[in-house]
Structure formats: C-alpha cells, structure tokens
Regions:
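Rhodanese-like catalytic fold shared by cysteine-dependent sulfurtransferases
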Residues: 1-40, 45-51, 59-92, 98-138
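Active-site flanking residues adjacent to catalytic metal/cofactor-binding acidic residues
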Residues: 54
Length: 138
C-alpha cells in the first residue's frame, strides 16, 4: 500500500489525466446511443412492447434473413417525416445492424431528434443468430 501511495503522489498529474479520460469515455459512450439490449430483452420487447423494429443492414442482407416483424431502412431515412420511418417520439424503437455499431450511431441521431425510447440490439444480428434465435427471410 505504501508503494501505491508513493506512486500516486509522484505521478499525481498522470493519475488525474487518466481518471479524466476514463470519465470522458464513459460519458461519451452513455450519450452515444440508445439502450443496449441483449437477445432476451429484445425478445421481451417484441412480445410485450410491440416496438418498431428497424434493420439497418443492406437490402440483400435483410432479404437473406432478419428478425420477425423488422422493416429494412437505411440509417439516412431515420428522420421525422420520412415515409419509411413511422415511429413517433415516445414509441419503442429497436435498431438492428450486423454488429451493433451502426445501430448505436443511429440511436444517437434519433435521441438528438427527440426520440426517447430507442434500443439497440447488442452485438447486432450476429449476436441474434449466434444465440440460436430464428430469422425470417424477406
């Protein structure tokens, strides 16, 4: 413990900088997008909340198989007033992509537009299929 205290006191600025960077990263990640949901929570949302499920992958990937009830839409169409995007600001929305990265960015964009109940399938469709859950060909 004595060595640890000595290290902290000798490297105080480095420690403060490191803690600041970690805090900024945590805040950034929390603001970045919607709530990340696992496959079990996603299944619960589909069965209980009747969400708008949007698959953000390409049309070819979507046609090969997606979550039942999902609509294929490009991230650029996730804006109020777009004919393909039917959700209102308080509706439950679930975004799906291949790995969860595109969905997280798009969820952040929706939050900036005032949408409050945005969810992202953690790990995307890859996680869904690895969990043994079914896909529907469109």
């Amino acid at each position: 413990m004595n060595k640890f205290s000595l290290f902290i006191s000798e490297n105080f600025l480095v420690v403060i900088l490191l803690l600041s960077l970690i805090s900024i990263l945590i805040i950034y990640e929390r603001r970045k997008g919607g709530k990340k949901v696992d496959t079990a929570e996603m299944t619960r949302l589909i069965n209980k909340e009747n969400p708008f499920v949007y698959d953000l992958r390409s049309a070819a990937e979507f046609s090969a198989g997606s979550v039942s009830g999902a609509s294929n839409i490009q991230p650029s169409s996730l804006v109020k007033g777009d004919a393909l995007f039917k959700a209102n600001e308080n509706d439950c929305i679930v975004l799906i992509c291949k790995t969860g990265t595109t969905s997280a960015k798009s969820a952040g964009d929706l939050k900036k537009q005032g949408y409050t109940n945005v969810n992202v399938l953690s790990g995307g469709i890859t996680n869904w299929t690895q969990s043994g859950l079914p896909l529907v060909k469109n």
